[in-house]
Every structure is written in structure tokens, then in C-alpha cells.
Amino acid sequence: MPFRDSLQPDTRYLTDGSLFHGYFYQYGDIWLAITFWCTVVTTISYLISGFVASFVLKKSKFSPFIPIFTAMYGMAIGICYGGISALILSAIYVSGSFLLSWYQGIICGVGLAIVHLLFAFTQGKLQV
């Protein structure tokens, strides 16, 4: 398998439900699985925080749009943060000739999202 082919993610995993079974062994597929789950969890958590903010600021004329903007922001953060972290994890898995099973991809993506959310939402408490 040429190196260039291993960098192209096989997007069939997103469309035929293969993110829920099987193993990933190519660089692009591992990256796609981890980035996808990190983005999903981050987007959902930012959407929930947007609904909370919209409820708290319900007298504002922009309050109905807050969840939309926070979800878009969460998606951008999930893609960037998850993409960079998944790049490193993919390199480790490919260079070590390991297989990434479907549930390990979910665990890595959700774990990365939780680490980011802990740092994002406890930022004021962690400052010295």
C-alpha cells in the first residue's frame, strides 16, 4: 500500500455505519474515527451549554441564536483539537502496526473531548 493511499480516509466508514464495528489500520481511517467522535461529543456539549446560556439570557433578543453559535463553535473546536490530537494518535498506531478497534476510536474521541471540556469549563478555577 503506497503512503499516499494511507493518507486518504475511506469515508465509507461514515456512511455505512462501519464506525461501530471492525478495525481501522490505515492512517486516514484512524484519524477520521477519532476526529469524528471528538467532534460529535464536543459539539453536543457546547450545544447543551448554549441552551443553558439561552435560558439564562432569555430576555436578550439574541438568545434563540446562542445554541446555534455555540454548537458551530464547538464543532470547529472539535475538528481542530480532535484533528490535531488524532494526528498524533494515528501516527502512533500506524508506526507501531497496531489496529484500532471501533470502540477504541470512540474511547479516544470521547476522552479527548472530556479533557478539552475540563480545561475549557474550569479555566477560571485553574488560574493562579
UniProtKB/Swiss-Prot annotation:
The keyword S-adenosyl-L-methionine does not apply. The keyword Membrane applies. Belongs to the TMEM170 family. InterPro entries: Transmembrane_pr_170. It is found in: Membrane. It is a multi-pass membrane protein. GO terms for cellular component: membrane. The chain crosses the membrane at residues 32-52, 74-94, 98-118. This is Transmembrane protein 170 homolog. Keywords: Membrane, Transmembrane, Transmembrane helix.
